[in-house]
């Protein structure tokens, strides 16, 4: 199993349009996408070999809307790119880590993703992502 790589850092925002600070810092939005199953509109900004993912809720009941309501805008998760998401999930579950998703679900860029509970990541929500070839 290859070592995971940092894919992106997810940042919850009320509005993608209001998050202009990143463009002022010289970053460019490379890709936007709505992931209806997760109730979120995303914008990816390239930062070297990684990305920032801005997450805007598409409705008041989305996970991101609830996160912003409870904690305000800010860092939501870190995402690690893996080559075999099922193997990683099976190993983590066998080791007793708490998973939000025991099986991958569709994510942005056509990737398969799964989240580990923040209790498993020292208070940090960790997303695993596998690119579909």
Tell where the protein language model's regions lie, with residue ranges:
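Conserved secondary-structure micro-motifs at functional edges
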Residues: 54, 58-62
